């Protein structure tokens, strides 16, 4: 077979695997869309449909790993006790980061909070249900099979910033992504993608990125009541944005478009970049060869 298809070891080149993933994903829509429509016709709301796109991406990923004669766990989904601990750790860190950002906005006079009279543990649980599926979906898409093939094919120095740009661009169509807000939101989203990418590289697992992503969104929306990436949320608290610039408060896009989010995320990226991680250095080198 011509070298354009296979490398010196006789394996299909990573670019073709990325194209295969995209092709299988597009083909899956022939089944996904009718199934989604049928479920909606039977009364399933958006809340209960949340697992459906995740199931679809998992199946596409599974098929690609089967074609490579690898287990699904090879993409960072080794569902064991260590994996669960990393998810929990990530959720705690992600929540703490968002609480720090909210506190900085509050101290700067950008927001006030009131308790929601209708608050309940059920609302927090509903938020957890929603955001766990969001985290799973976006991490599988942006830190899963495609990202890992990109690392194998080009190295992390190109794969990390490229996927960060794609992750940010994917949010450009969200509500509130306009004017100066777009600059700050794009910058912070790229930093967030770098953080999540390094979280995968330092652990060899999607557990920590999923936990970080979930904790960030859950604390931001379900707990603090901020908009999340431009989408309104009902939280335990009711935030009221005060008369301050949008670059300070994040505006209707949410705290992700705040300069404080940029500073906190940049600090987190620096810390995780300096962290040696839990993956043996030999494994990392082979991944970047």
Where in the sequence are the language-model features?
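N-terminal, membrane-interfacial amphipathic/helix-forming hydrophobic leader that caps
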Residues: 1-72, 76-79, 83, 220-289
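Juxtamembrane helix-loop-helix connectors linking adjacent transmembrane helices
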Residues: 5, 34-49, 70-140, 147-153, ...
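Hydrophobic alpha-helical transmembrane segments
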Residues: 15-19, 47, 51, 87-92, ...
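Aromatic-anchored segments of alpha-helical transmembrane domains
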Residues: 24-31, 95-99, 103-104, 164-174, ...
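Small-polar-interrupted transmembrane alpha-helices in polytopic inner-membrane proteins
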Residues: 98-99, 131, 135, 156-172, ...
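Membrane-interface helix caps and helix-loop-helix hairpins in membrane proteins
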Residues: 110-117, 173-181
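Membrane-interface helix/loop boundary segments of multi-pass membrane proteins
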Residues: 137-162, 175, 198-205
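Functionally important transmembrane alpha-helices
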Residues: 181-246
């Amino acid at each position: 077979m011509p070298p354009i298809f296979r490398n010196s070891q006789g394996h299909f080149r990573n670019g073709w695997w990325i194209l295969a993933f995209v092709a299988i994903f597009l083909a899956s829509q022939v089944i996904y869309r009718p199934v989604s429509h049928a479920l909606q016709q039977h009364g399933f709301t958006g809340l209960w449909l949340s697992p459906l796109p995740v199931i679809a991406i998992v199946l596409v990923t599974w098929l690609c790993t089967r074609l490579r004669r690898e287990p699904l766990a090879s993409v960072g989904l080794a569902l064991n006790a260590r994996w669960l601990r990393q998810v929990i750790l990530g959720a705690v860190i992600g929540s703490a980061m968002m609480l720090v950002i909210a506190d900085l906005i509050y101290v700067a006079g950008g927001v006030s909070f009131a308790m929601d009279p209708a608050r309940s543990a059920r609302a927090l649980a509903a938020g957890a249900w929603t955001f766990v599926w969001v985290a799973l979906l976006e991490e599988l898409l942006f830190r899963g099979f495609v990202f890992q093939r990109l690392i194998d094919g080009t190295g992390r120095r190109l794969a990390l910033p490229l996927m960060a740009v794609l992750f940010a661009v994917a949010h450009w169509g969200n509500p509130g992504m306009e004017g100066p807000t777009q600059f700050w939101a794009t910058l912070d989203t790229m930093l967030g993608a770098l953080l999540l990418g390094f979280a995968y590289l330092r652990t060899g697992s999607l557990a920590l990125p999923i936990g970080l992503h979930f904790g960030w969104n859950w604390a931001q929306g379900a707990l603090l009541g901020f908009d999340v990436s431009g989408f309104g949320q009902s939280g335990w608290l009711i935030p009221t944005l005060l008369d301050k610039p949008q670059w300070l408060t994040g505006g209707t896009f949410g705290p992700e478009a705040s300069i404080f989010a940029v500073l906190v995320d940049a600090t987190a990226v620096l810390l995780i970049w300096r962290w040696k991680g839990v993956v043996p250095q030999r494994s990392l080198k082979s991944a970047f060869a």
